[in-house]
């Protein structure tokens, strides 16, 4: 099989195939080449038929999509429109030679469709004609992309047009398609993965987990102009390790913390498991209000408690529980725990920039051979904005020595203090309760101290701190609460239970209502003293009640009142009983 490529001065055609045979007859498809791609454009193809003779090439090129046929033996073709070129072969070159025939056009006719047939008209012959023949394999259907330059010459043989013709014949290289690879995601069966989300490592928690001493902090920004920029709560409860040979269980606490803005209602409830689930709610109907004008006052409330926790194996321990000192074999020390901090910024202009709550409960290790249970306390802390209602309730058992010291050693209360009532109620001593293993204890009942071999000391626990900044101009930049409960180590052979205390602290903003109630068991001696050792409370306090109820045998000291609980007069220490 041979292909043909013919270039005339006024027209260019190409043929994929021509017939083989001695007669030299060929037919095929002639197509215009696209100048931009240097490739045949098959939408401009025409049917090409002709005869191939040693002396001349008679070529008929029909119009587009028009078939044509050879009707004459040599010179005459069909009755369809088209052009006929009479092309002479170059002298000295065989017409059958593979590679091409160098020709010149001697005559050209135009075939025109007429009513009776086809009219033939002589037309101007092209100035040159180059006919190329190339061999085609039977399996191939495409023309070669290049032609040997030696076979491309002008009709005169001068070779002037050789390079030009070669450039025309060369086809543009194929355009490579580049496929982008997408990121492969390998999934396990049944798992769903969000490719945009980082996967965080989840720590493994041991079987015995220390119920974190999660100190609750409720912050109420200004109701008018304050903007809460960022609140970060990152409590971490670490593992509880190696608490062998503990004979008496201690009940963990449960904590509920809710904060709403607008009609913000918040309640933090901590209930202890000892047949006693006490919850004291300071409702909005109670007639207690704090004046709207308190400037530059911060009164931290610190309650230092010395606690002792009696453990049983695999039991959970509340590090905030106070326990009376009981002499035991070795000395065990419980590091202090900062319990809670409540901060109420200004109602008008304060801006809360950032609040970070990051309590950390560290590991509790090696508390062997403890024989008596101690009941943890329950705490209720609530803060509301708008109809803000707040409750802070801490309840603990009897037989404890409670000291509620409200002091502002580093703060100054500079404004209005009105109507302070302090009622002290003393309960009668109730009978002594001796515990056995597995028995339930009334948290309000006192238990006699039982001497044992050695002495165990548990350092004080910082219970709560309430800070009320200025209502007008103070700006709270950053508040960080990071209480840490450190390790409890080596508290062996404790034989007598001690009941923790209960404390109620409530702070409200808007219809802010606050009550601080400390209840202890009977048989205790209570002393309620309101003094201003280093503070200045200069003005009005509206409707604040501080109720302190304690049992006989207990000594309670109220050293100072926070800004949320201002005094009537720093020099007036009247105690009102009701």
Curated annotation (Swiss-Prot):
Segments of this protein annotated with the region 3 X approximate tandem repeats: 180-557
Sequence repeats: 180-272, 304-425, 428-557
The keyword Transmembrane helix is annotated on this UniProt entry: yes
Induction of expression: Is induced within the initial hours of A.phagocytophilum infection and is strongly expressed during the bacterium's intracellular replication phase.
Keywords: Host cytoplasm, Host membrane, Membrane, Repeat, Secreted, Transmembrane, Transmembrane helix, Ubl conjugation
Region of interest (Disordered), residue spans: 144-169, 516-578
Membrane topology classification: Multi-pass membrane protein
Job description of the protein: Secreted effector that hijacks host cell SUMOylation during A.phagocytophilum infection and is important for the pathogen's intracellular survival.
UniProt name for this protein: SUMOylated effector protein AmpA
